[in-house]
Structure formats: structure tokens, C-alpha cells
Regions:
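Patatin-like phospholipase
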Residues: 15-81, 89-295
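Bacterial Sec-dependent N-terminal signal peptides
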Residues: 1-22
Length: 295
């Protein structure tokens, strides 16, 4: 009231001689900020999503991601293997579920996963086409020793596809996969040591390619002294990665296909896939026991 009277009756004197500074006392602590609300803010549980391998069946994991979005459930961490790594890696790098679904439906997977010569015939010179037409089997030699390929295909088309998609993503490793929209881990197997190798930094495309490298079908991804292939050999459902980092809720998605019948094993890579399926059965069951939710 006194201040109001001074302003009304002695404005000139007041403003010429007095500087009024008002400093409201503000407590920046979380407790003080929340004290005016009739409820307390609670820290939400951290959610980890674990995606298994499973070949084409891995595309069903897109539906799981859609369900998370539909119910507004945030995902804090993704650890994945093989096809799950491709789906999870694209999502972690900023792709929407609609965009991933569009890729799954519109990509010519027969071409991307082709086991034939990687160079398209339309890209060859005439003499190369003639040589290809005359060749039934091509064997390379190193000196006098024949060079036996490590796999049926180099997998270059798959590498190119993954490189293109990750380059177009909104988020990129810098260099850690923690820098992506969602923290991400790709699980692989070192063909030399037999150990599980968890990739958490570097080239995302290379990590996805390594995790999805089916033995005998695609060449291993060489990284340092390692030769990386499908992580499903040793850790198809890596729930332990989320448990180790202390996530509150672990959701595991198992899209692993069942074992093939005798009539379905007509090619070497189908036999190799069957062997992998047998090897993964018991570890899969143990891994799923560590999850809070299994889909």
C-alpha cells in the first residue's frame, strides 16, 4: 500500500531517485516445482525390446512395434539378432513403422538376397555376357591353388541395400549406437572364436549386415581380426543385454521358425538353417525366461 501511494503522489521524485528491483525467490528443485501439483511425478519404467532372428518371419516384428506406438509405450533400448536386427536397427535410426512396413512390402527381396552372380546382366559389357553364357562353373586360383569361396554369395546386394537405408535414416551413430533415436545393439557371432560379439558403435549398415549373415549363404563380415556372422548361433534372443543394463521391463519377441521337415531340406543352406534351429532351441527357452513379457 505504501508503494502504491508513493507511485500515485510522488511519481517524479520516486522514479528519479529510486530504482525498484523485484527478485522473486524461486526454488529450482524438483520438489519445489512439483509442490503445487495435487499429485507426485513418478519416473516411468524403462522398457527394453529384444528382437530375435527368424528370416522372413522377422517381418512380423513390425506389428509389435506398431502395437507399442498405438498404446504410446516408449522404447528405450533395442537388442536384436539377424532379421530382428534389421527391423530394430531401422526403427532405432528413426524410421517409422509405416516406412519399415513399406520397405518390407515393396522391396524386391529375391534380388536383394539373390545367391547368383552379384552383377546384373544389364550392367555387363558384351564380352562379359558372352563369357558368362559359356561358363557353367567359375573357379578362381591363387597360384596353383583353387580358391574355395566361403559362401554361396558375397552378399553385396544386401550390403548395398542396408547402406542405402541407413544413409537415409534420420539418426546416425556418432559413433555410438547410443546416439540413435533408440539405444541399439546388434548381436553377431565371431566365426573364428565362436564368441558372441555385441556391436554398439561404428557403421550401422555393417552391424546389420553382420548380424543377418546366414552361414554358407553370405560371406562373413570381416572386422578387425574377426569374421562376423549371424548372432543367432550363440544368442538368438539376447535378453541378458537388457537385464545387465538394468531395464525395468524386458519384452522379448520370438519370431524363430520351427524345424523343417525332411521334404523341406533340399539345399545345403536349408540344412544349415535346420542345424541352427536345433542349436537355438534350448538357449531360446533360457533367454525367454529372463523376459517380463514374451511375444
Amino acid at each position: 500500500l505504501t508503494l502504491l501511494l508513493l507511485l500515485l503522489f510522488q511519481p517524479a521524485a520516486f522514479f528519479s531517485q529510486t530504482k525498484l528491483i523485484i527478485r522473486p525467490q524461486v526454488d529450482d528443485s524438483l520438489t519445489a516445482r512439483n509442490s503445487c501439483y495435487p499429485f507426485k511425478f513418478q519416473k516411468r519404467p524403462r522398457v527394453a525390446l529384444i528382437l530375435s532372428g527368424g528370416g522372413a518371419r522377422g517381418a512380423t516384428q513390425i506389428g509389435v512395434l506398431k502395437a507399442f506406438e498405438r498404446h504410446n509405450i516408449p522404447i528405450d533400448f533395442i537388442a536384436a539378432t539377424s532379421m530382428g536386427a534389421i527391423v530394430g536397427g531401422l526403427y532405432a535410426s528413426g524410421y517409422t513403422t509405416t516406412e519399415i512396413e513399406s520397405l518390407a512390402l515393396n522391396t524386391n527381396w529375391d534380388e536383394v538376397l539373390s545367391l547368383t552372380e552379384d552383377t546384373k546382366r544389364t550392367e555387363l559389357f558384351v564380352d562379359q555376357k558372352l563369357q558368362e553364357d559359356r561358363s557353367f562353373l567359375v573357379v578362381r586360383f591363387e597360384g596353383l591353388e583353387p580358391v574355395i569361396p566361403a559362401a554361396v554369395s558375397s552378399g553385396q546386394r544386401l550390403t548395398d541395400f542396408l547402406s542405402t537405408q541407413t544413409l537415409q535414416a534420420l539418426y546416425h551413430p556418432n559413433p555410438s549406437f547410443n546416439d540413435l533415436k533408440v539405444r541399439f545393439r546388434a548381436v553377431t557371432t565371431d566365426l573364428i572364436s565362436g564368441k558372441r560379439i555385441v556391436l554398439d558403435r561404428g557403421s550401422l549398415a555393417e552391424a546389420l549386415r553382420a548380424s543377418a549373415t546366414v552361414p554358407l549363404v553370405f560371406n562373413p563380415v570381416k572386422k578387425d581380426s574377426m569374421q562376423l556372422i549371424d548372432g543367432g548361433l550363440v544368442s538368438n534372443i539376447p535378453t541378458d543385454l537388457a537385464k545387465k543394463e538394468g531395464y525395468d521391463i524386458i519384452v522379448a519377441v520370438n519370431s524363430t521358425s520351427g524345424l523343417r521337415s525332411a521334404d523341406e531340406m533340399k539345399a545345403p543352406w536349408q540344412t544349415a538353417d535346420q542345424i541352427m534351429g536345433i542349436m537355438m532351441q534350448q538357449p531360446n527357452e533360457a533367454s525367454m525366461k529372463e523376459a517380463d513379457v514374451v511375444i
